[in-house]
């Protein structure tokens, strides 16, 4: 049962509230809390000079600022603390604040708790953004007033009073956001699970545990959608509290969605033929099947078919950039894990020139080498993980007795230059890093845009 937002308004008014992080996504939250009558202090590691004009903008509406290296040392005396998702709740500063009586929460927890609209929550290791966008587009096609947020779109909490019971909200949720959740969306999906974010999570078990929060607090009339082809997610049916639908690329599924004789079906009804889909790769067929399961009760077959056969993809996801001298360039900068890069490689019909490497999330690259060695013509590596990836591939190349040229570079500019020089007519060059961007770029979008800019200058 959803709580009425008036309860939150009564609760937060006059409270001493700390918001940790003054990034773009937290700024609407800070302003909204001020509007609701809270006494807000915003915390950030950056100094005033690096934050720019936002510091003055917040001070003008009465927000106090705590900035600099030791900013978390001053969390004493607050009634409520909104933490940024990637910060662990067991940090000493949060533990101390909680012991002193602070209520520690996040924007997403409070949003799901009080949102009057129907909430669709999507998580998993790969395919989250594409599936979130597909669900959003299908609901929109059916003429629902639809909002999209979480990891994509815009922060939604500040808009909660505009939302109605007959609206639809689609959220992409990360393991960081789910880690402290004690509330679940009414309709939840786990796309698949493979090791990821082990630089933040203690181990893979904790990562899986966090993902399960997307359905752990559901009620009996809620829906959980699971991937039948993924052993980990398939077994979660036993823990479900409500209804379950499954999707599969390889098995016939009667209570869910599947690919049968190249037809995409939901509950036995044909939606479209796989040859009519614009999205590349079998992994995107899986994303469509998952979306069908989520919206089956709310969207007609016609709307599903329209989106499935017209949607051409999301930026930075196997995105075609251009063809130069017979060589095709693709931007798959979103691929921040080995499994996502492998899915991208599988969408091409021939071995590619792969540009990979980046920030080390402490996840193994052996599965990428094992599954991808025969899908790569030339491997160009950069970033913190370049030697780690090189080592994983060299082991596989050695015992498979195959050949693959591996080139180490120091920048994106150099990577594209080397790829361009080594490519022959008919080749495919793809940026699919298998790693996060933080060693060289603030996010995967900026990384992808730099790659596109360099390619467009060729």
UniProtKB/Swiss-Prot annotation:
One of the GO BP terms on file: cell wall organization
Molecular function GO terms recorded: ATP binding; UDP-N-acetylmuramoylalanine-D-glutamate ligase activity
Annotated compartments: Cytoplasm
One matching Pfam family: Mur_ligase_C
Keyword Glycosyltransferase listed: no
Cellular component GO terms held in the UniProt record: cytoplasm
EC numbers: 6.3.2.9
Pathway: Cell wall biogenesis; peptidoglycan biosynthesis
Catalytic activity from the UniProt record: UDP-N-acetyl-alpha-D-muramoyl-L-alanine + D-glutamate + ATP = UDP-N-acetyl-alpha-D-muramoyl-L-alanyl-D-glutamate + ADP + phosphate + H(+)
Domain of life: Bacteria
Positions annotated to bind ATP: 124-130
Keyword Cell wall biogenesis/degradation included in the entry's annotation: yes
InterPro entries: Mur-like_cat_sf, Mur_ligase_C, Mur_ligase_C_dom_sf, Mur_ligase_cen, MurD
Keywords: ATP-binding, Cell cycle, Cell division, Cell shape, Cell wall biogenesis/degradation, Cytoplasm, Ligase, Nucleotide-binding, Peptidoglycan synthesis
Protein task: Cell wall formation. Catalyzes the addition of glutamate to the nucleotide precursor UDP-N-acetylmuramoyl-L-alanine (UMA).
Sequence similarity: Belongs to the MurCDEF family.
Record NCBIfam families: murD (TIGR01087)
Protein name: UDP-N-acetylmuramoylalanine--D-glutamate ligase
Taxonomic lineage: Bacteria, Bacillati, Bacillota, Clostridia, Eubacteriales
Designated gene of the protein: murD
